[in-house]
Amino acid sequence: MSALEKSMHLGRLPSRPPLPGSGGSQSGAKMRMGPGRKRDFSPVPWSQYFESMEDVEVENETGKDTFRVYKSGSEGPVLLLLHGGGHSALSWAVFTAAIISRVQCRIVALDLRSHGETKVKNPEDLSAETMAKDVGNVVEAMYGDLPPPIMLIGHSMGGAIAVHTASSNLVPSLLGLCMIGVVEGTAMDALNSMQNFLRGRPKTFKSLENAIEWSVKSGQIRNLESARVSMVGQVKQCEGITSPEGSKSIVEGIIEEEEEDEEGSESISKRKKEDDMETKKDHPYTWRIELAKTEKYWDGWFRGLSNLFLSCPIPKLLLLAGVDRLDKDLTIGQMQGKFQMQVLPQCGHAVHEDAPDKVAEAVATFLIRHRFAEPIGGFQCVFPGC
């Protein structure tokens, strides 16, 4: 995910844990920007790329869950966008602007459970089955019994969830499926390296600007424009941090409560709590989701994914970075013409962020080729050779 997703493909990117394009350390702290140049790492609001935002309420046995969606467009099929693990719907921001300018379509970018601004009663359940049901429930809550034509597009973990959703027939009006940057074989091979990758990431950041700068310099996201909007959905303020004065009073309160403990353990406990709070004060931003704690679900996301993808009886598109490799099942399926594939060179794992225009062109061409959507502004299809 630039976090989890990238780690899952450790074996195929040239820059695993040394991250792509860097040739340097994971932290990216020593990477050079070029003499005399200063880039703008300030965050950009979602409203520069999406037309509206909505919190969709879904009823279930435990109560109400609220799913954040970002929307654009008013005509044509709905492109339902599912992000990778650790990311959010905002990772689709630049792609949204690009695709809307090429074909008539509607965008619905969804924050999956435990990600972004979505709030659910059971955030620990990240099984493929549960997340696929979430997608179906959101579609039903938004459109009722007569949903418009929908194409599912997912990146990495989101691509796997799109496939599980499609194979379970949870979206009745589904007309197409697109999987980006995920292949079962390489994903499964990389699972053993994932925890090491996650441990190598910074745990906290001094500011949003600092987080954005790290994501670009480390190679997590190679496109600064996308990073400036996408990273806002990946990090959050540490809990309990409001102001320096507020933080100080919290530390003092902790110390007073500890005074009744035995002297030896008391001083150690106090120092640890003070150190933790000082870290939060100096680095008040952290990741929205602790991906390392989701390990028990990783296998379920990707095992059997190739056959599930091939079995979906709808037009399918697979977009891969230049370093991706097809596994045996996908290779045979591609030779048999069971799906359209396009390789986008010079991209990292976050293909749709690194090259949003190329991905938009590929998706737009797919939509027009199958007569799912009409072109806009004289857009000319470029049909790939594979």
UniProtKB/Swiss-Prot annotation:
<comment type="subunit">
    <text>Binds PPP2CA and PPP2CB.</text>
</comment>
<feature type="region of interest" description="Disordered">
    <location>
        <begin position="1"/>
        <end position="38"/>
    </location>
</feature>
<feature type="compositionally biased region" description="Basic and acidic residues">
    <location>
        <begin position="268"/>
        <end position="280"/>
    </location>
</feature>
<feature type="region of interest" description="Disordered">
    <location>
        <begin position="254"/>
        <end position="280"/>
    </location>
</feature>
<dbReference type="InterPro" id="IPR029058">
    <property type="entry name" value="AB_hydrolase_fold"/>
</dbReference>
<feature type="active site">
    <location>
        <position position="156"/>
    </location>
</feature>
<keyword id="KW-0378">Hydrolase</keyword>
<feature type="active site">
    <location>
        <position position="349"/>
    </location>
</feature>
<keyword id="KW-0488">Methylation</keyword>
<dbReference type="GO" id="GO:0051721">
    <property type="term" value="F:protein phosphatase 2A binding"/>
</dbReference>
<feature type="compositionally biased region" description="Acidic residues">
    <location>
        <begin position="254"/>
        <end position="265"/>
    </location>
</feature>
<protein>
    <recommendedName>
        <fullName>Protein phosphatase methylesterase 1</fullName>
        <ecNumber>3.1.1.89</ecNumber>
    </recommendedName>
</protein>
<comment type="similarity">
    <text>Belongs to the AB hydrolase superfamily.</text>
</comment>
<feature type="modified residue" description="Omega-N-methylarginine; alternate">
    <location>
        <position position="16"/>
    </location>
</feature>
<feature type="modified residue" description="Phosphoserine">
    <location>
        <position position="42"/>
    </location>
</feature>
<dbReference type="InterPro" id="IPR016812">
    <property type="entry name" value="PPase_methylesterase_euk"/>
</dbReference>
<feature type="modified residue" description="Asymmetric dimethylarginine; alternate">
    <location>
        <position position="16"/>
    </location>
</feature>
<dbReference type="Pfam" id="PF12697">
    <property type="entry name" value="Abhydrolase_6"/>
</dbReference>
<dbReference type="InterPro" id="IPR000073">
    <property type="entry name" value="AB_hydrolase_1"/>
</dbReference>
<feature type="modified residue" description="Phosphoserine">
    <location>
        <position position="15"/>
    </location>
</feature>
<dbReference type="GO" id="GO:0051722">
    <property type="term" value="F:protein C-terminal methylesterase activity"/>
</dbReference>
<comment type="function">
    <text>Demethylates proteins that have been reversibly carboxymethylated. Demethylates PPP2CB (in vitro) and PPP2CA. Binding to PPP2CA displaces the manganese ion and inactivates the enzyme.</text>
</comment>
<keyword id="KW-0597">Phosphoprotein</keyword>
<keyword id="KW-0719">Serine esterase</keyword>
